[in-house]
UniProtKB/Swiss-Prot annotation:
It is an enzyme of class 6 (ligase). This is Succinate--CoA ligase [ADP-forming] subunit alpha-1, mitochondrial. Substrate binds at residue 171. NCBIfam families: PRK05678.1 (NF004230), sucCoAalpha (TIGR01019). Pathway: Carbohydrate metabolism; tricarboxylic acid cycle; succinate from succinyl-CoA (ligase route): step 1/1. Gene3D superfamilies: NAD(P)-binding Rossmann-like Domain (3.40.50.720), Succinyl-CoA synthetase domains (3.40.50.261). Succinyl-CoA synthetase functions in the citric acid cycle (TCA), coupling the hydrolysis of succinyl-CoA to the synthesis of ATP and thus represents the only step of substrate-level phosphorylation in the TCA. The alpha subunit of the enzyme binds the substrates coenzyme A and phosphate, while succinate binding and nucleotide specificity is provided by the beta subunit. It comes from Trichomonas vaginalis. One of its GO terms (cellular component) is succinate-CoA ligase complex (ADP-forming). The keyword Ligase applies. It catalyses: succinate + ATP + CoA = succinyl-CoA + ADP + phosphate. Heterodimer of an alpha and a beta subunit.
Amino acid sequence: MLAGDFSRNLHKPLLFIDKDTKVVIQGIGNQGQFHSRLMRQYGTKVVGAVHPKKAGTIIAGLPIFKNMKEVVKRTDANASLIFVPAPGAAAACIEAAEAGMGLVVCITEHIPQHDMIKVKKVMKETGCQLIGPNCPGLIQPGTHTKLGIIPTNIFNNGKIGIVSRSGTLTYEAAYATTLAGLGQSTVVGIGGDPFAGQLHTDVVKRFAADPQTEGIILIGEIGGTSEEDAAEWIAKTKLTQEKPVVASIAGATAPPGKRMGHAGAIVSGGKGTAEGKYKALEAAGVRIARHPGNMGKFIFEEMKRMGKI
């Protein structure tokens, strides 16, 4: 359906990562060290880290390089995971993109919105894909590859693609699909900030084009129009005639004008409500799970109805 959308990026994995993804860590403090170890234990190829003052040393079993250009030259890294604190995170994203990274995953929260506008401009100019900021990352059980802080024990290789603004609801959906025997193809936490890199539509398009992904769970939050935009694309392409989609939106009871956890989770001017998102998604043929505990049950029922299990 969508091969043309990605024809210019044939050298990049359709679902962002694969078994050959080589990862560099930017921000090798306590959290960077801890999660780099977990990533390697899972099977991810973490090839080094960047710290301008500690180049030439070994930290947490990783060789340390002075800058991103050096690490790319020495290791052929093609993806970066950023744990740099908020004041320097935008500069780290830009450095990674300009060094030729195909993918940047930014875990950092509280990056100024003005900084993120600059980051998104550079990402567009370089063709680098940004996931985040303020996200848990992504995981691909079939290749044992993950970038981020996602716990691995609840995932199993399978058929369902999950895209989510909420970290914890990502894990809820993953565990439910594992228990249902469906498993996951790739799971992407896009983050809850107003200026996120990948939005729901960007990821859903990739799931639609991926033959292993046979069903999709979309998890949104109040605020913004990412979910409505995805609903418009799903309706336009009649995606639900080919692959079932189940959606759940967090924040249905949030009072207008009050931020709920994530910087982007705020209803203002009568826009971004949970009901508005549900209405748009339902009109596109998406099955709605108003309680997140039903996500696994509903996607199982939809997969069975369409003869996919």
